Amino acid sequence: MVKAVCVLAGSGDVKGVVRFEQQDDGDVTVEGKIEGLTDGNHGFHIHVFGDNTNGCLSAGPHFNPQNKNHGSPKDADRHVGDLGNVTAEGGVAQFKFTDPQISLKGERSIIGRTAVVHEKQDDLGKGGDDESLKTGNAGGRLACGVIGFCP
């Protein structure tokens, strides 16, 4: 079993912790709690760089090693880092899901990359414009953190 953790922080009140677990070469389980969000859906993605020197902006674009368009976590054709939306109620998003495309090892590894929670709902690449195919029109980056191995 390989485990990783990400502590999310931003310039405002949004903060959280997300944990990742992978058994052998199976799907990755993603479990987290993010506080300080407005109620509703917020895009949640893995971005390329583990660089937060300029806040969440320096994390770069979505992790996309196969050079595909943005999509839903259920789409075969999507960025590896496209994890869809997390839903906040009462300012808190608590979630647990599995994802078949991210990994904690190998060429699709998210270790050392940045997890980002966004201001708006991710349209899952169905928005009908160029930005939808890049970012899902998820808006600004509220909080982020570098993903690292943990015991």
UniProtKB/Swiss-Prot annotation:
<feature type="binding site">
    <location>
        <position position="62"/>
    </location>
    <ligand>
        <name>Zn(2+)</name>
    </ligand>
</feature>
<keyword id="KW-0449">Lipoprotein</keyword>
<dbReference type="GO" id="GO:0005634">
    <property type="term" value="C:nucleus"/>
</dbReference>
<dbReference type="GO" id="GO:0019430">
    <property type="term" value="P:removal of superoxide radicals"/>
</dbReference>
<feature type="binding site">
    <location>
        <position position="45"/>
    </location>
    <ligand>
        <name>Cu cation</name>
    </ligand>
</feature>
<comment type="similarity">
    <text>Belongs to the Cu-Zn superoxide dismutase family.</text>
</comment>
<comment type="function">
    <text>Destroys radicals which are normally produced within the cells and which are toxic to biological systems.</text>
</comment>
<keyword id="KW-0539">Nucleus</keyword>
<dbReference type="InterPro" id="IPR001424">
    <property type="entry name" value="SOD_Cu_Zn_dom"/>
</dbReference>
<keyword id="KW-1015">Disulfide bond</keyword>
<keyword id="KW-0862">Zinc</keyword>
<feature type="disulfide bond">
    <location>
        <begin position="56"/>
        <end position="144"/>
    </location>
</feature>
<keyword id="KW-0186">Copper</keyword>
<comment type="subunit">
    <text>Homodimer, and heterodimer of Superoxide dismutase [Cu-Zn] A and B.</text>
</comment>
<feature type="binding site">
    <location>
        <position position="70"/>
    </location>
    <ligand>
        <name>Zn(2+)</name>
    </ligand>
</feature>
<dbReference type="GO" id="GO:0005739">
    <property type="term" value="C:mitochondrion"/>
</dbReference>
<keyword id="KW-0049">Antioxidant</keyword>
<dbReference type="GO" id="GO:0005829">
    <property type="term" value="C:cytosol"/>
</dbReference>
<dbReference type="GO" id="GO:0004784">
    <property type="term" value="F:superoxide dismutase activity"/>
</dbReference>
<feature type="binding site">
    <location>
        <position position="62"/>
    </location>
    <ligand>
        <name>Cu cation</name>
    </ligand>
</feature>
<dbReference type="InterPro" id="IPR018152">
    <property type="entry name" value="SOD_Cu/Zn_BS"/>
</dbReference>
<feature type="lipid moiety-binding region" description="S-palmitoyl cysteine">
    <location>
        <position position="6"/>
    </location>
</feature>
<protein>
    <recommendedName>
        <fullName>Superoxide dismutase [Cu-Zn] A</fullName>
        <ecNumber>1.15.1.1</ecNumber>
    </recommendedName>
</protein>
<dbReference type="InterPro" id="IPR024134">
    <property type="entry name" value="SOD_Cu/Zn_/chaperone"/>
</dbReference>
<dbReference type="InterPro" id="IPR036423">
    <property type="entry name" value="SOD-like_Cu/Zn_dom_sf"/>
</dbReference>
<dbReference type="Pfam" id="PF00080">
    <property type="entry name" value="Sod_Cu"/>
</dbReference>
<keyword id="KW-0560">Oxidoreductase</keyword>
<feature type="binding site">
    <location>
        <position position="118"/>
    </location>
    <ligand>
        <name>Cu cation</name>
    </ligand>
</feature>
<dbReference type="GO" id="GO:0005777">
    <property type="term" value="C:peroxisome"/>
</dbReference>
<keyword id="KW-0564">Palmitate</keyword>
<feature type="binding site">
    <location>
        <position position="47"/>
    </location>
    <ligand>
        <name>Cu cation</name>
    </ligand>
</feature>
<keyword id="KW-0963">Cytoplasm</keyword>
<feature type="binding site">
    <location>
        <position position="79"/>
    </location>
    <ligand>
        <name>Zn(2+)</name>
    </ligand>
</feature>
<feature type="binding site">
    <location>
        <position position="82"/>
    </location>
    <ligand>
        <name>Zn(2+)</name>
    </ligand>
</feature>
<dbReference type="GO" id="GO:0005507">
    <property type="term" value="F:copper ion binding"/>
</dbReference>
<keyword id="KW-0479">Metal-binding</keyword>
